[in-house]
Amino acid sequence: GVCLAETGHQVICVDNNEEKVKLMKSGQAPIYEPGLSELMQSNAKEERLVFTSDLAMGVENSDILFIAVGTPPLPTGESDTRYVEAVARGIGASLTTGYKVIVNKSTVPIGSGDWVRMIVLDGVAERKKESGTEIAAEFDVVSNPEFLREGTAIFDTFNPDRIVLGSTSQKALDMMQELYTPIIERKVAEDKSLPPVPVV
């Protein structure tokens, strides 16, 4: 999120941990990543970056919603996807009107786009049941796995060897291409003379 703000986008970072939100609002990164705190501070000062624990506010005020949560391994070796499920359900419960692209960046098994869509729809149904009102939620899901190394995540984000996008929706893919244009065109790359980043 911080790197997308650095490319000029308006970004709302949502975390359910109030202590982390307070830390991020103070300009401190909750993880060790060289240069991250400085990027957070400069983009918050430029009003391109906001931190909150209010998921509904983040959903309402965004066109593209990223699910970027941990998926620690279970004893079986499979990914623990409960945090992805909780966020997807929360997004569904917060959707109102207007088209949204929901992007899963978390490490999940291949084919999880349909699963994320189902969980979001469950969240929509729960909200509809609670409120008794019709909810016209329009959204598509994009899988966008990240290939970041701890300690060099900022460099890796701005200098990828490829960007991987998967979706059944061309509209969603077009929005993602537009979002990533500064990175694709190497505008924030260390070596700006390199050819455009391939999108696969």
Model-identified regions with their sequence ranges:
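Structural/interface elements that position substrates and couple domains in central-metabolism enzymes
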Residues: 1-200
